[in-house]
Amino acid sequence: MAEELSKGYQPGDVETQWYSRWIDAGCFRGDEKGEKPAYSIVIPPPNVTGILHLGHVLNNTIQDVLARRARMEGKDVLWLPGTDHAGIATQSKVEQKLRKEEGKTRRDVGREAFLDKVWEWKEEHGGIIIQQLKRLGCSCDWERERFTMDADYSRWISKVFVDLFNEGLIYRGKRMVNWCPKSLTALSDEEVIMKPQKSKLYTMRYRVAGTKNQWVEIATTRPETLMGDTAVAVNPKDKRYADLVGKMVIRPFPEAEIPVVADDHIDPEFGTGVLKVTPAHDKNDFAIGQKNNLEIIDVFHPDGTLNAFAGPDFEGMDRFEARVKAAEKLEAMGQLVKVEDYENSVGYSERADVPIEPRISMQWFLKYPCVEEAAAAVANDEIHFRPDRWKKTFAHWMEGIQDWCISRQLWWGHQIPVWYRKANAADLQARESLDATSAGDDIYVGIDPPGDADQWVRDEDVLDTWFSSWLWPFATMYKSDEESSPTLKKFYPTTDLVTGPDIIFFWVARMIMAGFRWQGEVPFKNVFFTSIIRDKKGRKMSKQLGNSPDPLDLMAEFGADALRFGLMRIAPTGTDVKFDDDQIVEGRNFANKLWNAARYRQMQEGAVEARPVDFAS
């Protein structure tokens, strides 16, 4: 007689036992040699530093539903898992650990020793989120788990860089980037968090050159950068200042004559309608400077302190201290008109939690390949966006696409595969522009180091994390030196992608371009954009607000199925949802009803004896 089901449903025990049986029976293996129709999906690789949050739960539950449905439909299913090395996120964690335990910085221990520590940390902590995904019940083919720093995957990264460099699409140059003065690296837009902030709006005045008492009032939130001003600007349609355009005004300190220019970017309604132009420290100002051939004066060191160009009164001072000092100096000169409270949004480094600086820096850039093909694939529904309203967002970004800053001043990541001949390395690295045409014999770009490696020095920068993840759908399926593989032939292009709309540019668009460039076709056929989960008050969940429940606690209390059921019930694709524990309680109650129904049937006279399922049959 079959063992009687317990009176109360214990989801933890039942779910764990079933998952182990599925794994032991090989239920999740993708069979590239099978004759059934293929279904494939690649997991958006979570950060190796990560732990499960509700966004992960929703995203991976949707993927699991799609994969399990495909198996029920008789398809060979490959759900390919893996993790991302998460450059700055992982490096930051190890740097914090190093400071706490040894009182040292990464530069104190050196690059090689520091990277050894990162790998040690990764081996110790890197599998946590994978184990959590298994507890959630994800039916991935775990035997195929990949990591973006795997040796084979890393060779793919180098190959792609070499291909694009040789095609003239990768170059090095001086451009304005998001700069973190704490981590001392360029950041992607995705790594910058906009935060509302209570600031001050300073109205100051510059004297018109050649006059004794004609002044121009200028509004700014950043008086600490005025030492880098090389113009002031007005809107060409602003009649108040039409007679000023083309004249010169006098910058207070260091004293210099600078021109008044006209630019459509200037908002006549902001402040006085006149803005200072500091090309080295503002993206819009940089563009104005390029149009008007203005001098670029960088007044900051990389760490956010002021340099010699700021003058002796400010050199070495922190940027925020310099803001106060500059206002005081203007007031002493009689050129500070007023100071008002002002609320604005300021970009913060997501990891370092400090305000970023727009900064002109020597970086590596990529001109995107296959832009037209990618745009057409979405516009013509070769790739279906669900919901399709995201097509407009995608098209708008593709129309205004700009070159991608792919270099980062970090140590953890894929080091750029460029070597400089030692004898000329300093001159080569100081060049303001470098590409395949101008490289010459003193620069080597390759997958492997040059044969006489001791005569060369490697570029110290690493590649943006997204430069590895944009290859994820195909680089996980075969090696870079292979023409193809049975896995690629069977399962590529993948069927579906499930991701958040916040990375439609950073990941989705780039994967489509990479798919066309290296595989000649789209990387997936459908993209499902998930909801953003908010709390009951509609606020985004965060550790700071304390409104983000731990999914592991919820699974321990209610069961994984209850959590999955509750989230799926409230999460229509692409629409923000408000989370409440009551939804998970509903999931638990539903599971209890199913259990009690099975138990009731078991107790009836003449009930069929329950037997273990034979997965092999």
Q: What function would you assign to each model-found segment?
A:
Residues 1-237, 261, 278-291, 295-310, ...:
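N-terminal, positively charged nucleic-acid-binding surface of large information/translation enzymes
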Residues 1-10, 376-389, 606, 610-613:
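Short, contiguous pre-domain boundary segments
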Residues 47-81, 96-98, 180-182, 191-209, ...:
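Conserved active-site neighborhood of enzyme catalytic/cofactor-binding cores
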Residues 103-116, 307-316, 540, 547-552, ...:
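Short beta-alpha connecting loops at secondary-structure transitions
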Residues 243-246, 250, 312-323, 332:
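A glycine-biased structural micro-motif
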Residues 301-302, 368-388, 488-490:
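Residues forming anionic-ligand binding surfaces in small-molecule and nucleic-acid pockets
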